[in-house]
Amino acid sequence: MRFLFLFLFLFFSFQQNSWSENILTEFLVAKPSMPDPRFKETVIVMLYHNQGKGAAGLVINKPIRTMLISEFFKSSNMTPPEKIVDKEITLYWGGPVDAEHVFFIHSSDYKSNDFISSNRDFTITQEPKILFDIVKNKGPQEYIILSGIAAWEPGQLDSEMMRDDWNKKSNNYTSPFDNGKEMWSRLINSRDI
């Protein structure tokens, strides 16, 4: 039931682009004492946090696997363009909820028409057009592709914050495009966290 609630919440929020409390300028950094093994040493870019509605974000430092973009098209049941520049991409674990949903975080040099959230440095979208532009060498300079999302029910993330599982960090200190594997250790060892 919890996952059905989260799916419906995320589906309608994304469809309506109605993030009333967009906090894309914040990252959550798991503390070394994080009790949930799924979130050990994770860095999450926050999409939304509202005590009454819950929270959502994307884990940005957990690569799952590297593959050719043609493999990604095939595994996503998408028809690739006829002429494809087959380059390697890395798929990241975005979180434990809705693993079949794909998200893209890309640099601001590329414009998405249908985006979930955006700031001056990067944009988050589910628009598949970005893949077609990447294979045509018309995509963003920087991007990451994520499977799944991290989502919390109302009050759940607040409890985890009170329990001291997470630290907040502004995006002045990192970018989603920094080295994923080393991002957590660099952030957790910085003085201001």
Please tell me what each predicted stretch does:
Residues 1-3, 140:
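Short hydrophobic/aromatic segments of transmembrane alpha-helices and their interfaces
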Residues 3-13:
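Sec-dependent N-terminal signal peptides
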Residues 19-146, 150-193:
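A short aromatic-anchored loop/beta-hairpin motif
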